[in-house]
């Protein structure tokens, strides 16, 4: 199972306390196709994988025909998430980037229909853990 989690939805925390893998994108140095291929390979081999929601990552998953679920916060929960980014120590530039692009990025995910993608909108103040546990059970 591949879950693409919007920033702040709890990917890293989930991986610390469960059998999910948080596949960090940084080592791939923007080689999004390789990142998607590694996630798909891990998923095909029984791992539950969480990755980022960068547009290029979602496009790469489509390119390799990998099924995936995107977990996003409610678009109205922006202030909660900006506070969450601050509390977890993200940089001012990161927080500003999310603040300036919040609506555009979430809308881009929702407005691009595809047969390979399932979208889950978290409840207010929610995190990916509750949904990831259920997704993982379905794919064992």
PLM-predicted stretches and their roles:
Residues 30-33, 77-87, 131:
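Short, charged, surface-exposed secondary-structure boundary motifs
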Residues 15-50, 81:
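Conserved substrate/cofactor phosphate-moiety recognition/catalytic segment
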Residues 3-6, 23-25, 49-54, 72-74:
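Short His-Asn-centered micro-motif
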Residues 20-22, 68-70, 117-120:
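Conserved beta-strand scaffold positions in the cores of enzyme catalytic domains, especially
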Residues 90-140:
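Small-molecule kinase domains that catalyze NTP-dependent phosphoryl transfer to phosphate-bearing small molecules
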Residues 10-12, 56-60, 78:
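Short, well-ordered alpha-helical microsegments
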Residues 1-18:
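Glycine-rich phosphate-binding P-loop
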């Amino acid at each position: 199972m591949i879950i693409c989690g919007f920033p702040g939805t709890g990917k890293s925390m989930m991986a610390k306390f469960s059998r999910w893998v948080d596949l960090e994108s940084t080592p791939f140095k923007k080689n999004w196709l390789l990142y998607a291929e590694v996630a798909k390979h891990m998923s095909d081999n029984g791992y539950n994988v969480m990755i980022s929601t960068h547009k290029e990552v979602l496009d790469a998953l489509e390119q390799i025909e990998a099924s995936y679920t995107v977990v996003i916060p409610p678009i109205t929960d922006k202030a909660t998430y900006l506070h969450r980014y601050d509390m977890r120590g993200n940089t001012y530039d990161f927080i500003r980037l999310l603040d300036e692009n919040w609506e555009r990025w979430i809308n881009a995910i929702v407005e691009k229909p595809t047969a390979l993608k399932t979208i889950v909108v978290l409840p207010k103040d929610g995190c990916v853990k509750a949904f990831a546990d259920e997704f993982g059970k379905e794919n064992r």
